[in-house]
Protein backbone atom coordinates (compact mmCIF):
# COMPACT_ATOMS: atom_id res chain seq x y z
CA UNK A 1 0.00 0.00 0.00
CA UNK A 2 1.04 3.64 0.29
CA UNK A 3 2.61 5.49 3.20
CA UNK A 4 2.71 9.12 4.21
CA UNK A 5 6.52 9.05 4.31
CA UNK A 6 7.47 7.22 1.10
CA UNK A 7 4.55 8.16 -1.20
CA UNK A 8 3.16 11.26 0.47
CA UNK A 9 1.64 12.88 -2.65
CA UNK A 10 -0.19 9.72 -3.65
CA UNK A 11 -1.23 8.96 -0.07
CA UNK A 12 -2.77 12.37 0.54
CA UNK A 13 -4.18 12.69 -2.98
CA UNK A 14 -5.99 9.37 -2.87
CA UNK A 15 -7.37 10.06 0.58
CA UNK A 16 -8.84 13.37 -0.59
CA UNK A 17 -10.32 11.85 -3.77
CA UNK A 18 -11.85 8.84 -2.05
CA UNK A 19 -13.10 10.85 0.93
CA UNK A 20 -15.03 13.13 -1.42
CA UNK A 21 -16.36 10.10 -3.29
CA UNK A 22 -17.60 8.69 0.01
CA UNK A 23 -19.25 11.93 1.11
CA UNK A 24 -21.14 12.35 -2.17
CA UNK A 25 -22.08 8.67 -2.40
CA UNK A 26 -23.62 8.82 1.08
CA UNK A 27 -25.47 11.99 0.07
CA UNK A 28 -26.84 10.21 -3.01
CA UNK A 29 -27.80 7.15 -0.97
CA UNK A 30 -29.78 9.28 1.48
CA UNK A 31 -31.57 11.15 -1.31
CA UNK A 32 -32.18 8.12 -3.56
CA UNK A 33 -35.86 8.16 -4.63
CA UNK A 34 -36.26 4.45 -5.45
CA UNK A 35 -35.12 1.13 -4.01
CA UNK A 36 -33.09 0.35 -7.14
CA UNK A 37 -31.24 3.66 -7.00
CA UNK A 38 -30.74 3.28 -3.25
CA UNK A 39 -29.11 -0.13 -3.71
CA UNK A 40 -26.84 1.21 -6.45
CA UNK A 41 -25.77 4.24 -4.45
CA UNK A 42 -25.03 2.17 -1.35
CA UNK A 43 -22.91 -0.11 -3.54
CA UNK A 44 -20.91 3.01 -4.41
CA UNK A 45 -20.60 3.80 -0.69
CA UNK A 46 -19.14 0.33 -0.09
CA UNK A 47 -16.66 0.86 -2.92
CA UNK A 48 -15.60 4.28 -1.63
CA UNK A 49 -15.01 2.85 1.85
CA UNK A 50 -13.02 -0.04 0.40
CA UNK A 51 -10.84 2.31 -1.64
CA UNK A 52 -10.08 4.42 1.43
CA UNK A 53 -9.11 1.29 3.35
CA UNK A 54 -6.85 0.20 0.47
CA UNK A 55 -4.64 3.29 0.68
CA UNK A 56 -2.68 2.49 3.88
CA UNK A 57 -1.33 -1.02 4.34
CA UNK A 58 -2.02 -0.79 8.08
CA UNK A 59 -5.77 -0.59 7.33
CA UNK A 60 -6.22 -2.94 4.39
CA UNK A 61 -4.38 -6.03 5.62
CA UNK A 62 -6.36 -6.31 8.90
CA UNK A 63 -9.59 -5.67 7.00
CA UNK A 64 -8.87 -8.47 4.53
CA UNK A 65 -7.94 -10.82 7.36
CA UNK A 66 -11.14 -9.97 9.22
CA UNK A 67 -13.41 -10.79 6.26
CA UNK A 68 -11.84 -14.13 5.40
CA UNK A 69 -8.84 -13.40 3.19
CA UNK A 70 -8.07 -11.72 -0.16
CA UNK A 71 -10.59 -13.79 -2.12
CA UNK A 72 -13.56 -12.37 -0.20
CA UNK A 73 -13.34 -8.76 -1.49
CA UNK A 74 -12.94 -10.09 -5.04
CA UNK A 75 -16.20 -12.03 -4.67
CA UNK A 76 -18.00 -9.09 -3.03
CA UNK A 77 -17.09 -6.69 -5.81
CA UNK A 78 -17.79 -9.27 -8.52
CA UNK A 79 -21.36 -9.36 -7.19
CA UNK A 80 -21.44 -5.54 -7.14
CA UNK A 81 -20.15 -5.48 -10.71
CA UNK A 82 -22.88 -7.89 -11.83
CA UNK A 83 -25.45 -5.53 -10.30
CA UNK A 84 -23.94 -2.52 -12.08
CA UNK A 85 -23.87 -4.38 -15.41
CA UNK A 86 -27.55 -5.22 -14.91
CA UNK A 87 -28.27 -1.55 -14.19
CA UNK A 88 -26.39 -0.51 -17.32
CA UNK A 89 -28.25 -3.03 -19.47
CA UNK A 90 -31.56 -1.87 -18.00
CA UNK A 91 -30.91 1.86 -18.54
CA UNK A 92 -28.14 1.93 -21.09
CA UNK A 93 -25.92 4.98 -21.53
CA UNK A 94 -22.23 5.76 -21.77
CA UNK A 95 -22.31 6.88 -18.14
CA UNK A 96 -24.00 3.73 -16.84
CA UNK A 97 -21.53 1.48 -18.65
CA UNK A 98 -18.74 3.67 -17.30
CA UNK A 99 -19.89 2.95 -13.75
CA UNK A 100 -20.05 -0.77 -14.57
CA UNK A 101 -16.51 -0.61 -15.97
CA UNK A 102 -15.32 1.14 -12.81
CA UNK A 103 -16.58 -1.74 -10.67
CA UNK A 104 -15.04 -4.25 -13.07
CA UNK A 105 -11.76 -2.38 -12.63
CA UNK A 106 -12.10 -2.81 -8.87
CA UNK A 107 -12.48 -6.58 -9.30
CA UNK A 108 -9.44 -6.63 -11.58
CA UNK A 109 -7.42 -4.57 -9.11
CA UNK A 110 -8.31 -6.79 -6.15
CA UNK A 111 -7.63 -9.98 -8.12
CA UNK A 112 -4.26 -8.61 -9.23
CA UNK A 113 -3.36 -7.64 -5.65
CA UNK A 114 -4.29 -11.15 -4.53
CA UNK A 115 -1.99 -12.62 -7.19
CA UNK A 116 0.91 -10.35 -6.27
CA UNK A 117 0.49 -11.17 -2.58
CA UNK A 118 0.70 -14.88 -3.33
CA UNK A 119 3.84 -14.33 -5.40
CA UNK A 120 5.45 -12.26 -2.66
CA UNK A 121 4.55 -14.86 -0.03
CA UNK A 122 6.33 -17.65 -1.92
CA UNK A 123 9.89 -16.57 -0.93
CA UNK A 124 8.80 -16.39 2.71
CA UNK A 125 7.46 -19.94 2.65
CA UNK A 126 10.66 -21.16 1.01
CA UNK A 127 12.87 -19.34 3.52
CA UNK A 128 14.19 -16.80 1.00
CA UNK A 129 14.61 -13.18 1.96
CA UNK A 130 12.37 -10.51 0.55
CA UNK A 131 12.26 -6.74 0.72
CA UNK A 132 9.25 -4.67 1.69
CA UNK A 133 6.77 -3.73 -0.97
CA UNK A 134 4.16 -1.07 -1.44
CA UNK A 135 0.56 -1.03 -2.66
CA UNK A 136 0.71 -3.63 -5.42
CA UNK A 137 3.88 -5.34 -4.31
CA UNK A 138 5.50 -4.71 -7.70
CA UNK A 139 8.06 -2.20 -6.51
CA UNK A 140 11.01 -2.26 -4.10
CA UNK A 141 11.82 -5.92 -4.65
CA UNK A 142 14.97 -7.59 -5.90
CA UNK A 143 15.64 -7.72 -9.63
CA UNK A 144 15.07 -11.46 -9.84
CA UNK A 145 11.79 -11.28 -7.96
CA UNK A 146 10.72 -8.28 -10.05
CA UNK A 147 11.26 -10.30 -13.23
CA UNK A 148 9.16 -13.17 -11.86
CA UNK A 149 6.35 -10.83 -10.84
CA UNK A 150 6.32 -9.00 -14.18
CA UNK A 151 6.08 -12.28 -16.07
CA UNK A 152 3.29 -13.58 -13.85
CA UNK A 153 1.36 -10.30 -13.96
CA UNK A 154 1.62 -9.69 -17.71
CA UNK A 155 -1.85 -11.05 -18.48
CA UNK A 156 -3.36 -9.03 -15.63
CA UNK A 157 -1.77 -5.88 -17.04
CA UNK A 158 -3.13 -6.58 -20.53
CA UNK A 159 -6.62 -7.19 -19.13
CA UNK A 160 -6.45 -4.02 -17.07
CA UNK A 161 -5.39 -1.67 -19.87
CA UNK A 162 -8.88 -1.21 -21.40
CA UNK A 163 -10.35 -0.80 -17.92
CA UNK A 164 -7.87 1.99 -17.23
CA UNK A 165 -8.95 3.69 -20.46
CA UNK A 166 -12.59 3.45 -19.32
CA UNK A 167 -11.68 4.92 -15.92
CA UNK A 168 -9.89 7.86 -17.49
CA UNK A 169 -12.80 8.46 -19.90
CA UNK A 170 -15.22 8.51 -16.97
CA UNK A 171 -12.92 10.83 -15.02
CA UNK A 172 -12.76 13.26 -17.95
CA UNK A 173 -16.54 13.17 -18.39
CA UNK A 174 -17.03 13.89 -14.69
CA UNK A 175 -14.51 16.74 -14.75
CA UNK A 176 -16.23 18.27 -17.80
CA UNK A 177 -19.55 18.18 -15.95
CA UNK A 178 -17.94 19.73 -12.88
CA UNK A 179 -16.51 22.58 -14.96
CA UNK A 180 -19.45 23.19 -17.31
CA UNK A 181 -22.28 22.66 -14.84
CA UNK A 182 -24.35 21.05 -17.58
CA UNK A 183 -26.92 18.56 -16.29
CA UNK A 184 -27.10 15.03 -17.63
CA UNK A 185 -30.06 14.22 -19.84
CA UNK A 186 -32.73 12.60 -17.62
CA UNK A 187 -33.10 9.75 -20.11
CA UNK A 188 -29.36 9.07 -19.98
CA UNK A 189 -28.73 9.32 -16.24
CA UNK A 190 -27.61 5.96 -14.85
CA UNK A 191 -29.78 4.42 -12.15
CA UNK A 192 -26.79 4.32 -9.80
CA UNK A 193 -26.98 7.93 -8.66
CA UNK A 194 -29.47 10.68 -7.96
CA UNK A 195 -30.19 13.10 -10.81
CA UNK A 196 -28.51 16.42 -10.01
CA UNK A 197 -30.56 19.42 -11.16
CA UNK A 198 -29.19 22.37 -9.17
CA UNK A 199 -26.07 24.01 -10.68
CA UNK A 200 -23.93 23.37 -7.60
CA UNK A 201 -25.15 19.78 -7.24
CA UNK A 202 -24.39 19.13 -10.91
CA UNK A 203 -20.82 20.31 -10.48
CA UNK A 204 -20.29 18.40 -7.24
CA UNK A 205 -21.77 15.24 -8.76
CA UNK A 206 -19.37 15.51 -11.68
CA UNK A 207 -16.51 16.10 -9.28
CA UNK A 208 -17.47 12.95 -7.35
CA UNK A 209 -17.45 10.86 -10.54
CA UNK A 210 -14.04 12.31 -11.40
CA UNK A 211 -12.69 11.62 -7.91
CA UNK A 212 -13.75 7.98 -7.83
CA UNK A 213 -12.70 7.12 -11.40
CA UNK A 214 -9.42 9.05 -11.41
CA UNK A 215 -8.52 7.80 -7.94
CA UNK A 216 -9.15 4.21 -9.00
CA UNK A 217 -6.98 4.70 -12.10
CA UNK A 218 -4.18 6.41 -10.16
CA UNK A 219 -4.17 3.72 -7.50
CA UNK A 220 -3.94 1.00 -10.17
CA UNK A 221 -1.17 2.40 -12.37
CA UNK A 222 1.57 0.20 -10.93
CA UNK A 223 -0.35 -2.94 -11.91
CA UNK A 224 0.31 -2.00 -15.55
CA UNK A 225 4.10 -1.90 -15.19
CA UNK A 226 4.64 -5.31 -16.87
CA UNK A 227 3.53 -3.72 -20.17
CA UNK A 228 4.16 -0.02 -19.37
CA UNK A 229 7.21 0.24 -17.08
CA UNK A 230 6.94 4.03 -16.70
CA UNK A 231 3.77 3.52 -14.65
CA UNK A 232 5.98 2.53 -11.70
CA UNK A 233 6.97 6.20 -11.32
CA UNK A 234 3.45 7.64 -10.96
CA UNK A 235 3.23 7.23 -7.18
CA UNK A 236 5.35 10.09 -5.76
Regions found by a protein language model. Name each.
Residues 1-236:
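Alpha-helical membrane segments of multi-pass proteins
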Amino acid sequence: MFTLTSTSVTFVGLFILFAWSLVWSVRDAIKAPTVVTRISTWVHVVMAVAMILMVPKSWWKPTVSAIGGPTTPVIIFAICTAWMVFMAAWRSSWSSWGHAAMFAAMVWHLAAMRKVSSLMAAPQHSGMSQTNYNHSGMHSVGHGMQTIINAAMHDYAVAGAPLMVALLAMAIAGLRRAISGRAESPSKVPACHVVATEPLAIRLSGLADFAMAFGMAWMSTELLTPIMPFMAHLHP
